[in-house]
């Protein structure tokens, strides 16, 4: 591998600022790596000319004596549901396959202001609906650990880009586990911040009360640095919090494992959990205990209802959010146009994939007259109870730990005809989205077949610094 491919941004930054390497050379090396690994299908589009031009401009900025940004020269991949002005914003869907964004997302503006370099847009499950990155209109993404396996989803392209050294850091989005589950499957770190910590302006909506932009990286320090840049209140997103952005990088650097109280829910270790994954996760927890942490049993009694609750509420929000894609204003328009209603119906039927249509229909059903109270309203009540379970547990512990996924990476195509089996892959991740709290997946080891296993740490609201610090501690064990 090229000596211009790095494992951490701190290594790259030292070389860039000492002028031992140039932004242009590093960017070119990553673009070459993307070409070498194109069979993995991690990218929908590669910004070769734009990236090289930006890198060249950054080199000139440094040569002129101007202060470099916090992310100077950081090569990044961006999930293709996050708006970048002038670039295609497809959401992995036929209906938006030719749509170009006319503005930058707030997170993108913040990254650009700190001198990051965007290498390309990462592949994803269509409209972020999936757990395998197989529902993309642009084809499935393959896991770089084992190309016969899925990389997880929906941010599978972002995860593979980082895991295969085609980007140093990537942005993804997490509605029910879409950053953490692919991070687990690809043996990297995946952070979902607290709801409202990062602006959703410019993130194409799936479930507006669940969605959060997250970070995928190989080190906790890199995730902390990028979060520090993109977090914060935004006038363009009324759901962002005015909670001050903490110095996450400093928190990670000064963290001590001794005395940390880790809650272990019995509900996360059931017969549904793969036995090899259970053994790997428990071994990592014992290693944390040996390092000074305290393991404390906790209970999350309503977690058994989490998956059903999530798929009622998230699909209801998707039904509403995706109503805007009708062929009239932008996106794909069917040639069947005998009247307006036929144009609407045909454009959506032809433009959306099977999984998206399935979730729109389910969401429309639970919102319909006669079923709203039985399903949607009841699910909202259960959502509140699930959050209360977490807040009660956090009265006695600092974080909650368990497996990220109940199963290891599965074979491409294995679950495409069984949506319920696919949905079960989210069983441990959806509770953090339902509760609006931060969570992170960290590599914990591997199965006998050398497939990655992730361990998940769920934190208190706005406790990103703590879970990022634990991620660093786990990496050193």
Curated annotation (Swiss-Prot):
Listed EC numbers: 6.3.5.7
Entry annotated with the keyword Protein biosynthesis: yes
Superkingdom of the source species: Bacteria
A Pfam family assignment: Amidase
Active site residues per record: 79 (charge relay system), 154 (charge relay system), 178 (acyl-ester intermediate)
Cellular component, GO, one term: glutamyl-tRNA(Gln) amidotransferase complex
GO terms assigned for molecular function: ATP binding; glutaminyl-tRNA synthase (glutamine-hydrolyzing) activity
Family annotation (SUPFAM superfamilies): Amidase signature (AS) enzymes
Biological-process GO terms, alphabetical: translation
UniProt keyword list: ATP-binding, Ligase, Nucleotide-binding, Protein biosynthesis
Record's catalysed reaction(s): L-glutamyl-tRNA(Gln) + L-glutamine + ATP + H2O = L-glutaminyl-tRNA(Gln) + L-glutamate + ADP + phosphate + H(+)
Family membership: Belongs to the amidase family. GatA subfamily.
Subunit structure: Heterotrimer of A, B and C subunits.
Family annotation (HAMAP family): GatA
Family matches, as PANTHER family: GLUTAMYL-TRNA(GLN) AMIDOTRANSFERASE SUBUNIT A, TRANSAMIDASE
Biological role: Allows the formation of correctly charged Gln-tRNA(Gln) through the transamidation of misacylated Glu-tRNA(Gln) in organisms which lack glutaminyl-tRNA synthetase. The reaction takes place in the presence of glutamine and ATP through an activated gamma-phospho-Glu-tRNA(Gln).
Protein name, entry field: Glutamyl-tRNA(Gln) amidotransferase subunit A
Organism: Chloroherpeton thalassium (strain ATCC 35110 / GB-78)
Gene designation: gatA
């Amino acid at each position: 591998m090229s000596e211009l491919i790095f494992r951490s941004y701190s290594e790259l930054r030292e070389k860039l600022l000492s002028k031992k390497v140039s932004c242009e050379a590093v960017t070119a090396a990553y673009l070459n790596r993307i070409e070498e690994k194109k069979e993995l299908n991690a990218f929908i589009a590669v910004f070769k000319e734009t990236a090289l031009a930006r890198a060249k401009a950054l080199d000139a900025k440094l040569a002129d004596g101007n202060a470099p940004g916090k992310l100077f020269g950081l090569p990044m991949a961006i999930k293709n549901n996050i708006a970048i002005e002038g670039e295609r914003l497809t959401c992995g869907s036929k209906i938006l396959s030719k749509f170009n964004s006319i503005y930058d997302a707030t997170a993108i503006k913040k990254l650009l202001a700190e001198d990051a370099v965007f290498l390309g847009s990462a592949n994803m499950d269509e409209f972020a609906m999936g757990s395998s990155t197989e529902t993309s209109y642009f084809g499935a993404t393959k896991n770089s650990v084992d190309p016969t396996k899925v990389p997880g989803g929906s941010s599978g392209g972002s995860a593979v880009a980082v895991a295969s050294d085609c980007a140093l850091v990537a942005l993804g989005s997490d509605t029910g586990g879409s950053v953490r589950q692919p991070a687990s499957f690809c043996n990297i770190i995946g952070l979902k911040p607290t709801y409202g910590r990062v602006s959703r302006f410019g993130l194409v909506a799936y479930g507006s009360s669940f969605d959060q932009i997250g970070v995928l990286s190989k080190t906790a320090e890199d995730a902390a640095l990028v979060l520090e840049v993109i977090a914060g209140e935004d006038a363009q997103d009324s759901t962002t919090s005015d909670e001050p952005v903490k110095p996450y990088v400093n928190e990670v650097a000064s963290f001590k494992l001794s005395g940390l109280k880790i809650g272990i829910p019995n509900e996360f270790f059931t017969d549904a959990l793969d036995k090899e994954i259970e053994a790997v996760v428990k071994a990592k927890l014992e290693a944390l205990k040996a390092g000074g942490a305290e393991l404390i049993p906790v209970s999350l009694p309503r977690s058994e209802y989490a998956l059903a609750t999530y798929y009622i509420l998230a699909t209801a929000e998707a039904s509403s959010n995706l109503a805007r894609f009708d062929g009239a204003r932008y996106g794909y328009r069917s040639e069947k146009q005998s009247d307006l209603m036929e144009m609407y119906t045909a454009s959506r039927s032809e433009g959306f994939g099977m999984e998206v249509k399935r979730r729109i229909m389910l969401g429309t059903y639970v919102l319909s007259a006669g079923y709203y109270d039985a399903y949607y309203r009841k699910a909202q009540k259960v959502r509140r109870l699930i959050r209360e379970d977490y807040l009660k547990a956090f009265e006695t512990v600092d974080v909650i730990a368990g497996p990220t996924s109940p199963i290891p990476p599965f074979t491409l195509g294995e679950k495409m005809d069984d949506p319920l089996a696919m949905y079960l892959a989210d069983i441990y991740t959806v509770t953090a989205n339902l509760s609006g709290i931060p969570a992170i997946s960290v590599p914990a080891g591997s199965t006998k077949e050398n497939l990655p296993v992730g361990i998940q740490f769920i934190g208190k609201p706005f406790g990103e610094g703590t879970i990022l610090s634990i991620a660093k501690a786990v990496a050193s064990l």
